[in-house]
Amino acid sequence: MKTGNQFNTVALVGRSNTPGIAEPLATLADSIATLGFEVVFEGDTAREIGIAGYPALTPAEIGARADVAIVLGGDGTMLGIGRQLAPYRTPLIGINHGRLGFITDIAASDMQALVPVMLAGKFEREERSLLEARIVRDGEPIYHALAFNDVVVNRSGFSGMVELRASVDGRYMYNQRSDGLIVATPTGSTAYALSSAGPILHPQLAGIVLVPIAPHALSNRPIVLPDDSKIAIQIVGGRDVNVNFDMQSFTSLELNDTIEVRRSKHTVPFLHPIGYSYYTTLRKKLHWNEHASNEDDKAS
């Protein structure tokens, strides 16, 4: 296990069904092993790329055995393995092999230079919060899930508006007619919530944001809540209503079902290269107006 900031066992996780990912993963594995680290692979990744010579483990086995997981893929890959490793507090290093790369912040072209430095203990660490949600039907919980980005209650593409009753900490907030409601973490505030005109929350802000999706009343605006809030969303009206967790798992809902959402007790450690800036990520990914001559403020 760890000695200070040092790691012994490194797990590699790759984006599934991705052409061209086998070679960089194999190269990365060999280079890490050459440095003296034990390298293991997530089982599905190992099978898909057909790599041999390294143990293939389940996410639970990775959580129990690995000191750090390196994820080569897109944000969706990072979200998926992050939820599975959250109970084990396994730190994640994200290498972008997808499109956007908000949370996989290392370019694939930089991984051979940056990963050895980070494995030697030179990195910046931050904790990312998750949500836990459960569906209650007739007074009994019927489904439970974690979400890294968001919990989204919405209508299907062929039905009309839904009516939702929202309360926070047992206090009634409103009834809302809309296409749905997003409950997002700070990490998820730059995902679906942002496209629905929600605010950007810094990842270290202790908050949860509620963002209506195409509300009938324009006065239904996003609201940021303390991250210890307990949110309940009841299905009052509408047909074909679903709830999604990070857009990677979903279940159908019935009238009077209640979705209860709160901050999870788990957090996921993200490791970044020295000098990482969240604001640089925002500028690059959201294409904010910037001038090449601008730099971070100099320390006075």
From Swiss-Prot:
Q: Which reaction does it catalyse?
A: NAD(+) + ATP = ADP + NADP(+) + H(+)
Q: Does the keyword Coiled coil apply?
A: no
Instruction: Tell me the Gene3D superfamilies matching this sequence.
Output: Probable inorganic polyphosphate/atp-NAD kinase, domain 1, Probable inorganic polyphosphate/atp-NAD kinase, domain 2
**Pfam annotation, one family:** NAD_kinase
Which cellular component, as a GO term, is one annotated location?
cytoplasm
The main enzyme category here is transferase
Q: Where in the cell is it found?
A: Cytoplasm
GO biological process: what's one of them? NADP biosynthetic process
**Could you say which cofactors this protein requires?**
a divalent metal cation
State the protein's purpose. Answer: Involved in the regulation of the intracellular balance of NAD and NADP, and is a key enzyme in the biosynthesis of NADP. Catalyzes specifically the phosphorylation on 2'-hydroxyl of the adenosine moiety of NAD to yield NADP.
Q: What is this protein called?
A: NAD kinase
* Family indicated by similarity: Belongs to the NAD kinase family.
Q: Where does NAD(+) bind?
A: D75, G76, N149, D150, R177, D179, T190, A191, Y192, A193, L194, S195, A214, Q248
Task: List keywords of the entry alphabetically.
Answer: ATP-binding, Cytoplasm, Kinase, NAD, NADP, Nucleotide-binding, Transferase
- Offer an example of a GO molecular function term for this protein: metal ion binding
